[in-house]
Each structure stands twice: as structure tokens, then as C-alpha cells.
Amino acid sequence: MKVSVVVPVRDEERSIRELLDSLLTQTRPPDEIVITDGGSTDATPQIIEEYIHNGAPVRLIRAGAALPGRGRNLGAAQASHEWLGFTDAGIRLENNWLEALVAKAEADENVDVVYGSWQPVTDTFFKQCAAIAYVPPPTSHGGIITRPRFIASTLLRREAWQAVNGFPEELRSAEDLIFMDRVENAGYRFVFEPRAQVHWDLRPTLWSTFKRFVVYSRNNIRAGLFRQWQATVLFKYYGVLAVLLAAVLIFKPSLVWFPIAAWLLLLTARAAVAIRRNRFCYPASLLQNLARGAMVMPLIAVLDAAAILGSIQWLLLDCFRWSRKTPVEAGNGA
């Protein structure tokens, strides 16, 4: 079995060396690495060219302005081999990542897609709190600890990619979720390989987290996934609080503090639930959990604000144009 690993990049000069080094030192190195640059304005292409000049099995595609879905499609289309591995810049691969994926695929000729596991990088107090706030904890199925499917830790047959016409190309995020669902709905067989581990670096500050999740929010709606996130935030939480605030302002303005107190209590409860849900991933003392709660609460508030702002952006910028297309058609520029 020969494997081409496809990586979309843009402005990744800080992380691209680590990714390339980890790919080239795999216990089972890829036969080819295809990198699509989506319009970098930093030194990313020059760094990649250094590796090519030094004889690494790397190909660079300069795609101009390209979002991740288009980058993956261009890379997959020009890849030389039947099996396609996907990962991203900013991801740290375990040394046996590709070996584990390939072994799983070779063990059963009926397998079409192998997806590995992943872990958030929690090397600071903030990142640990961020993981508690928004990263779903692993679950156990039949004694095997699993994570949701993650395109940055995936190996699949080219045929599966071709059958669904590749990734949506006009989405900044969630294009991988649509792609995976379409492949599964087309009847291709998925298997999980827990030994294929990658490490996902989280945003390091509240502001960078907010900016990233505004993008996620807008594109989540464009992908047709509103009910999976924003609906709960807008209707279950803030819809009720808005009604309560309106009632107080109309009937008892002196109690305007009450909706604010209710919001803070709600944030406290949600933070407590998140900490409890992750107690096995991040065990801690009561005092440590209290400190985490003080950080998880503003993180949840920031995520809510991002969900709301992204929804407003979608309403103002995308709603009418997108309503004339299905999410998948819109994602492919149809």
C-alpha cells in the first residue's frame, strides 16, 4: 500500500517545520506529502521549498486564495497514490500515527476509511480550561476509548473521496464534517484506530478563542448545522434570559439585577457541569476545580458571544444567498 498525505496550509511558518519533521520521521513514512498553500503571506512556502530542495518527498501546490476544503481537494486530485492520508498544520503527530492507520487498513480489505484518535494540547492552565469548556471528552464503546471523527487523523481510499466529489470548498470550517457524513452515507466502511494519535493545539487566549469561534459559528450555519450548537445557545439559554429581562424592564425595573444574577448562575452551573464531565480526563482537587471554574465561566461566555456574533454575520452576509442553495451545493461553489 502506498500513501499520499495531503495537508492544506496558510500562514503556518511557526508550525510547518514541526509537522514536516514529524511526517518524515514516522515509523512508516508517507510515500508522498502533498501540501497545498492557500495564499500564505508569510514564509510558509519558502520553508516547504527548503525541504523539497533537500530531497524530501514533498510536493507544493500554490493554490492562491483557497480555504481548507479546496486545499484538500487540489492536493488529493494531484496525489499519486490510491490511499490518501489527511492532517493539518498545527497538529502534532505521534511517531506511529501513519503506521497504525495503514496497519488497520491492510488488516481488512473491505475497509475504506480509517480514522484515528486525537488529544487537545493542555500545556497551560488556560488551555486545560478551554478543553474543559468546549472539547468533548472521550467516550467508551466496548471498552475502547473513542473520540469524534477528525479529518486531521484520517486515511481513506481515493475512491471514497471521488465518490462524493470531495470536500465542500466555500466553508472555512465544518467542511470536514460534511465530507465525512457524505462518505458514510455513500456506503463506505469506517473503522477506528485508537493507536493513531495526533495532538491538537488549542487557542491560547480568550481573544483568539473568540475570533476562531466566530468563524466556526458562521460556517456552522452555512453547513446546515445550526441545531447542533447555536440553537441551544440562542433559544435555550439567551432566549429565556431575554424574555426574563424584558418582563422585568416592563413590570419591575428595580429588579433589573435579577436577569444578570440568573445569567451568572447559569454560567456557574454550566461550568460545574463541564468540569464534572471532564473529571476523569483532568482530575483535580476541589481548590483546583474552583480555580478552573473561575476561568471556564468566562470561556463559556466568550463561546456564547461568538455563537451569537457568528449567527448575526450569517444573517447579514449569507442568509439570502445561502437560502438558494443546499449546504453541500453551497459548500462546493455550485
Kindly give the residue locations of the regions a language model identified.
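Short aromatic/hydrophobic "clamp" motif used to bind/position activated sugar donors
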Residues: L84
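A conserved acidic beta->alpha catalytic loop
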Residues: S22, P29, D37-Q46, I91
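Glycine-rich, basic loop-to-helix element that forms the pyrophosphate-binding segment
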Residues: A63-A79
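Catalytic donor/gating beta->alpha subdomain of glycosyltransferases that bind UDP-sugars
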Residues: P168-Q228
